[in-house]
Amino acid sequence: MPNTSSESLPRDLAEDVVKEVNRDQVKIAAVQISGYDKGDERREGYDAADELIPYIGRAGEDEAQLVVFPEYILGHIKVPSSSTEKIATAAAKHSIYVIVGCWEVYNDDTFANTALFFDRDGKIMGKYYKTHAAVDHYEGTPAWSRPPSDKSREWFLKNDPEWIMNRGNDLPVFEFDFGRVGILTCYDGWFPEPFQVLSLKGAELIVWINGRGGSVEDFIMKTAMFQSHVAMVTANQAYGSGTMIGDPSKWPTRILARCPDKSEAYISATIDLRRIRKIRSTSRNFQERRPELYGKAVEPMSNNGPCNS
């Protein structure tokens, strides 16, 4: 599974906009919008990328450095494709980073739940593959140990695609020109360890993209910001809610902007990376860690569950 794409746009596409990089005060935008969902097939004549382009332009005019879109939203696509080329063109035009989710389809018809990172020149600078599968159906003991055995590939694609997706095996941190960024996708954020690992790898900002009904949990976001000293951005599809931007430098943490309703919305806010870096460099939490006590957290769980091993 490739990690990066060499596809990029001609430099002159980005010549109209040249942004001065401020590594201390960084404006971030997030968009709550619906496109393709978890089990959706491609619809002829519909490209969800077309829905995103105006928001990339709005974020650029808003002088944001990064704009974040939800999980799944581009649907099942090859990378690169006409959809990614549209995003790349808009990113280059407005000299802005873009993070957006899709089902990335490979030549052998396998696929992954992928977050694409576009840099200011429109190049796909990296990818993140969802690591924890949010499956809905199972059989066997213990629970969730294996998928239903009597279902076809077509059934899984429509009803429970994460059973058969290629799962990621890494929690990478990406170097942006304003700072270090990690990413998680939906169910990944229900585990405390990924937030901690990304922070310990140097992430100053964690992006958490979602595609689900209900609201993204602000208590998870606040806990992660407080314990791991990272800023956070969440983005959800518009049939849900809870798109947020948060800053841990406001004691104990603060949600700077949010979308509380199930509707299409755009938010932006400025995070204080200078202060976050200072907090990270002087954190008692980091200095007083006792990793020799935490081994149980990374041991596989026995078939009898965590309390009976």
PLM regions with names:
Residues 80-99, 180, 185-273:
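CN hydrolase (nitrilase-like) catalytic-core segments centered on the catalytic cysteine
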Residues 50-63, 89:
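A short, N-terminal amphipathic alpha-helix
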Residues 2-19, 146-148, 223-224, 236-309:
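C-terminal beta-strand edge segments of enzyme domains
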Residues 10, 106-201, 210, 219-223, ...:
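Active-site catalytic loop in hydrolytic enzyme cores
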Residues 17-28, 173-182:
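Beta-strand-turn-beta hairpins that frame and shape the catalytic cleft
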Residues 30-37, 59-80, 209:
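Short, conserved active-site loops that position catalytic residues or coordinate cofactors/metal ions
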Residues 71-87, 108-111:
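Metal-dependent catalytic neighborhoods of phosphoester/phosphodiester hydrolases
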